[in-house]
Amino acid sequence: MKISARNQLKGKVVSIENGSVNAIVHIDIGGGNVLSSTVSLAAVKELNLEVGKEAYAIIKATSVMVGVE
C-alpha cells in the first residue's frame, strides 16, 4: 500500500457503530489507545471491515479533528 500520509497506525477493529449513512469505526492501536473514525457505510462494505480485522488508521495533518468531552 503506497500513500502520501505519513501517520499510519496499525491496529484492530474493536467495534463498528452503523448509522443511516455513516459508521464510526473504533480501532485499538495499542497502549490502551482506541482511535475512532467516521467513514461511509459504503467504505465499511468495500473494505470488508469487521470486528477483529486488522486495519490502518491513516492520518493526514490537514484532516485531523480535535474534540473534548
Curated annotation (Swiss-Prot):
One GO biological process term: molybdate ion transport
Domain Mop: 2-68
Residue ranges the record marks as coiled coil: none
Pfam families: TOBE
Keywords: Molybdenum
Transmembrane spans: none
Family: To C.pasteurianum MOP proteins.
Function noted in UniProt: Binds one mole of molybdenum per mole of protein and contains a pterin.
NCBIfam families (UniProt xref): Mop
Protein name: Probable molybdenum-pterin-binding protein
Biological source species: Haemophilus influenzae (strain ATCC 51907 / DSM 11121 / KW20 / Rd)
Lineage start: Bacteria, Pseudomonadati, Pseudomonadota, Gammaproteobacteria, Pasteurellales
